[in-house]
Curated annotation (Swiss-Prot):
Protein name listed in UniProt: Agmatine deiminase
Chain's role: Mediates the hydrolysis of agmatine into N-carbamoylputrescine in the arginine decarboxylase (ADC) pathway of putrescine biosynthesis, a basic polyamine.
HAMAP family attached to this UniProt entry: Agmatine_deimin
Complex and partners: Homodimer.
Single biological process term from Gene Ontology: putrescine biosynthetic process from arginine
Protein origin, superkingdom: Bacteria
Active-site residues, Swiss-Prot/TrEMBL: 357 (amidino-cysteine intermediate)
Pathway noted in the entry: Amine and polyamine biosynthesis; putrescine biosynthesis via agmatine pathway; N-carbamoylputrescine from agmatine: step 1/1
Pfam (any one): PAD_porph
Key words, A-Z: Hydrolase, Polyamine biosynthesis
Catalytic activity reported: agmatine + H2O = N-carbamoylputrescine + NH4(+)
Family that this chain belongs to: Belongs to the agmatine deiminase family.
């Protein structure tokens, strides 16, 4: 594998928008019993449904441990899904995996961020995370992609969204958290994002969704749907703890221009629930010191914004909530050229994330 000493920007590479043509989507098989209830079996069923939904539109590669390989291979029984044996600590490939970058000639490379399980020993969600730290380089090696390495700079893919035209959206709650890069200032973080993703403007929203255990990842709160247009998780209920967060984000977006000088068009996506885990669901999770506790009194950070754009499709979570159909209708209106597929999201939410968190798109190479 080739490790480059330059930066993507210096080499003419940038992170494309999620709606750019893709060659495949990466996923990782869930099995961690101190995060996924009942040994991960319900979450595995949800993963199968999501992988098969994506495979209708493009290829999927699922990384799975040696212990679960036969099970995963048997259940992911469609030709468009490849299963590869790969060790990991958990299934959050959006955050532990690489970020792919592309140049004008269509060449694809990868950025291998440093990963510390969302905070390391200062609020992180599990330890150890050494296998997850290797995941990005393993994916890039399988794909024969040259890689850039950001030693000393922690970043998760779910903490950023880009429009492919120079603008990145993130949250202060995550990127300025003391458990990520306390040695860096906001300006230094912006400079690194500029070097490795080739963005010219960083839009800082104050917070992500309430109780998001990743410290407010933007991919659960606000995402691009096309250049200059975003979809923001929203509530009109002033008693909802998300109310102030949504309105603060809207205030920033309404008073900010993007890298191209455009004012943002903001669409509002209703938040489901409030949603909570049941006592039975929490009891199915192994209680291990150092791992995130599951408690039925803690509100879950459910969000329809946590969807994935694929070639011709939108794969979005459903929660058996009255708001599910409204979310589907809004997404179909916003993406008229795509087919919206709602996939089971509750088991993923119980584990701390959702469809976007558990997937990583790989852009398609092309010739200029």
């Amino acid at each position: 594998m080739t490790t480059l000493n330059s930066t993507p920007r210096a080499d003419g590479f940038h992170m494309p928008a999620e709606w750019a043509p893709q060659t495949q989507v990466w996923m990782v098989w869930p099995e961690r019993p101190d995060n996924w209830r009942l040994g991960g079996k319900p979450a595995q069923a949800a993963h199968v449904a999501i992988a098969k939904a994506i495979a209708r539109f493009e290829p999927v590669t699922v990384a799975v441990s040696a212990a679960q390989y036969d099970n995963a291979r048997a259940r992911l029984d469609v030709p468009n899904i490849r299963v590869v044996e790969m060790s990991s600590n958990d299934a959050w490939v959006r955050d532990s995996g690489p970020t792919f970058v592309i140049n004008e000639r269509g060449e694809v490379r990868g950025v291998n961020w440093e990963f510390n399980a969302w905070g390391g020993f200062d609020g992180g969600l599990y330890a150890p995370w050494n296998l997850d730290s290797q995941l990005g380089s393993k994916v890039l090696e399988i794909e024969r992609c040259p890689r850039y390495v950001t030693k000393g700079f922690v970043l998760e893919g779910g903490s950023i969204h880009v429009d492919g035209e120079g603008t990145l959206i993130t949250t202060e709650e995550c990127l300025l958290n003391r458990n990520r890069n306390p040695h860096l200032t906001r300006e230094q973080i912006e400079a690194i994002l500029g070097d490795y993703l080739a963005v010219d403007k960083v839009v800082w929203l104050p917070d992500g969704l309430f109780n998001d255990e990743t410290d407010g990842h933007v991919d659960n709160f606000c995402c691009y749907i096309r250049p200059g247009e975003v979809l923001l998780a929203w509530t009109d209920d002033p008693e909802d703890p998300n109310y102030s967060r949504c309105h603060a984000a809207l205030g920033i977006l309404e008073n900010t221009l993007d890298a191209k000088g455009r004012a943002f068009i903001v669409h509002k996506m209703p938040i489901p629930g409030p949603l909570f885990a049941t006592e039975e669901e929490c009891a199915g999770v192994d209680q291990v010191h150092g791992s995130q506790e599951r408690n039925p009194s803690v509100r879950l950070a459910g969000s329809y914004v946590n969807f994935l754009i694929v070639n011709g499709g939108i794969i979005a979570p459903s929660f058996d909530d009255p708001m599910d159909e409204k979310a589907r209708e809004l997404l179909q209106t916003l993406f008229p050229e795509h087919e919206v597929v709602m996939a089971p999201g509750r088991e993923l939410l119980l584990g701390g994330g959702n469809i976007h968190c558990l997937t990583q798109q790989q852009p398609a190479p092309h010739k200029a």
